[in-house]
């Protein structure tokens, strides 16, 4: 988004080319057949060959790390906004559908931090994932109004606005949302408020 805006503001197409090249490489190499994505791809800096595929902040390299999926949905929706290239929106839809159909997706649509984590339902939820998806859905609804994405986003926002996730005024360190997860494998930011969870929540409210 920043690179595309840089081209719009400066008239220099270099930023646009970098953005679309990165998006296309991600589209080609990050996704599995079911629409889920890896977190990190290591490339040979000289040849561009894929060396390793990782999920650094998820349960396992082949697991469905929830926030990574949310960023894929959100990010490729943004790519479509700027380029109007349908392949980006199609990927956002594929990843969204994978999440919605996953047997471990909770009924309130606030995902576990990793949908393949071993102790579900006794695993932490990640509110930042839900907020990010909700914000993306409100934008996706503009492009695919027949898919009911606005209503789906409303369902997520209703969950996030409930006492289970929305903090009481003046509590939770003055953050809005509780129960986000940074990186369980690294023992960092587990079941805490996160600034980007609040960001996506406020953005979703604004888009609504």
Question: Each predicted region: which residue ranges?
Answer:
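Glycan-recognition and catalytic cores of secretory/periplasmic carbohydrate-active enzymes
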Residues: 1-208
């Amino acid at each position: 988004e920043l690179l595309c805006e840089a081209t719009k503001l400066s008239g220099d197409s270099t930023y646009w080319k970098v953005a679309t090249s990165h998006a296309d490489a991600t589209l080609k190499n990050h996704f599995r057949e079911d629409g889920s994505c890896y977190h990190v791809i290591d490339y040979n800096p000289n040849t561009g060959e894929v060396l390793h595929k990782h999920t650094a902040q998820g349960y396992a390299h082949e697991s469905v790390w929830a926030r990574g999926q949310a960023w894929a949905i959100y990010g490729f929706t943004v790519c479509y906004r700027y380029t109007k290239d349908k392949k980006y929106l199609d990927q956002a839809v594929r990843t969204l559908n994978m999440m919605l159909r996953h047997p471990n997706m909770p009924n309130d649509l606030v995902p576990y931090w990793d949908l393949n984590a071993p102790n579900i339902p006794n695993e932490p939820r990640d509110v930042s994932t839900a907020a990010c998806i909700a914000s993306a859905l409100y934008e996706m609804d503009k492009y695919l109004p027949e898919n009911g994405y606005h209503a789906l986003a409303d369902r997520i926002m209703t969950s996030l606005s409930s006492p289970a996730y929305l903090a009481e005024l003046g509590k939770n360190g003055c953050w809005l949302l509780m129960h986000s997860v940074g990186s369980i494998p690294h023992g960092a930011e587990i079941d805490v408020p996160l600034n980007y969870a609040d960001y996506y929540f406020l953005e979703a409210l604004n888009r609504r």
